[in-house]
Amino acid sequence: MTWLKSGASSLLFVALLLLVSLPRPLCAGEALVGGQYLSAAGQDIQLLVTVSSPAPSTLIVIQNLPPGTVIDAASPAFNQYDAGKGEVKWLLTHVNPGRYTVSLRLQRPVVSGGISGDIRYKDPGSGRMINLRVRP
């Protein structure tokens, strides 16, 4: 009878282990969007944005630079730049799951730690606005 109890316990343990290790769908707002700097100092700034499914339809990407920074080039083209505040904004529409790189070429280099970013989006499941802070 003891072997039945230990066998049942082992079977239950294996069943629970399998259940926990199965891939699960994302909950609303959980890890839908991520951001990581590929380059955060010098003249070339690159922010990698990763979007999971279900993708929000629109992303607002905000890059904070030192005030007065001169931008030589941007890819994609930004929608707004307030040089006095050092705030660059992109509105990315028709977003699909995948990776997006936002790049800036600056006239003068910025020091490490001199920038930060935000990614804003509406969670498709809950309808809440999410603000993701990105730091180098």
Summary of predicted features, one role per range:
Residues M1-K5:
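N-terminal secretory signal peptides that target proteins for export/translocation
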Residues P56-I60, N64-V95, R99-T101:
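A surface/secretory-pathway sequence property marking extracellular, secreted
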Residues R120-P136:
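Extracellular/luminal low-complexity Ser/Thr/Pro-rich, glycosylation-prone repeat/linker regions
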